[in-house]
Regions:
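Catalytic cores of enzyme domains
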Residues: 24-30, 120, 127
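Iron-sulfur cluster-binding cysteine motifs and their immediate structural context
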Residues: 1-23, 30, 36-60
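Long, compositionally biased charged/polar accessory segments in the mid-to-C-terminal portions
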Residues: 49-262
Length: 262
């Protein structure tokens, strides 16, 4: 895995512990000291491709056990989406406030790029959902080069005409469900075709698409033109005001007895 062999060894926040078999092991801890202070992981912030997004997602804890107990592993992805709650829903906002979730976290969830990619547009998928671990690291499957036999007469190919087989990607992201994987790829292809027609003035797309024009343009802006604050929407975990936190850091250092400077 490229991430394991490059990002983790060079990461200053990784966890190193002794392993009796390999003599050493390095684990990603998701840069929790940075996240708790409203900062993204160092690998996400320094990513040259600017293709990593970090945000808040609300989900229903009461449904987790039922999701994990799903008999057909190809249904786990759809059941996982059912766990994710709409942060704009008044009932969800009311329940979040009742649970003591701050307004900063609610606003962060409403602006979350992760919610848009995962639930609103449905173009991000979990890695190996059949393990039933409820992963919250999601991936937009890649659009690989098209096959040689269709390059001469096709500008944008169908999802099944990519060089990387749909079944291979489905085994990674949807527990082998090729229908969901092909649908996800087609949404990204539709966005690309929409933007091409928008720039060239060729008119609307001549086939049925699942997303609206506003959704496809919003996807284009997030994936291609997003700024730092659009890609990383992370509320601070500190319970005190910024002024109060700085005052405690000045008087006591970062290890505050009250826990306010964590």
């Amino acid at each position: 895995d490229f991430f394991v062999w490059t990002s983790v060894p060079s990461c200053p926040y990784k966890k190193i512990f002794y392993n009796w078999e390999t003599n050493k092991a390095e684990k990603c801890v998701f840069c929790y000291p940075r996240l708790e202070n409203g900062l993204p992981q160092i690998c996400a912030e320094t990513c040259v491709g600017r293709m990593r997004y970090v945000g808040v997602v609300f989900y229903d804890m009461d449904k987790v056990e039922a999701m994990a107990a799903t008999k057909n592993e190809q249904d786990i992805y759809e059941n996982t989406l059912d766990l994710i709650l709409d942060p704009h829903d008044p009932e969800v906002i009311k329940a979040a406030r009742a649970e003591g979730i701050s307004e900063a976290w609610i606003k962060a969830a409403q602006k979350s790029p992760v919610y848009k990619l995962v639930k609103e547009w449905g173009v991000a998928l979990p890695l190996h959902p059949e393990y039933r671990t409820l992963p919250m690291v999601w991936y937009v499957p890649p659009l690989s080069p098209i096959l040689q036999r269709v390059t001469s007469d096709v500008y944008l190919p169908d999802a099944h005409e990519m060089r990387v087989p749909v079944q291979y990607l489905a085994n990674l992201f949807t527990a082998g469900n090729t229908e969901i994987l092909a649908r996800t790829l087609q949404r990204v292809l539709d966005m690309r075709e929409y933007m091409r027609r928008r720039e060239t003035g060729d008119g609307p797309i001549d086939h049925n698409v699942e997303l609206t024009e506003d959704q496809m343009y919003g996807m284009y802006k997030l994936l291609a033109l997003s700024k730092y604050n659009d890609r990383f929407v992370i509320p601070s975990d500190v319970k005190v005001s910024r002024e109060g936190r700085l005052e405690m850091q000045h008087n006591r250092g970062f290890a505050c007895p009250t826990g306010g400077c964590q």
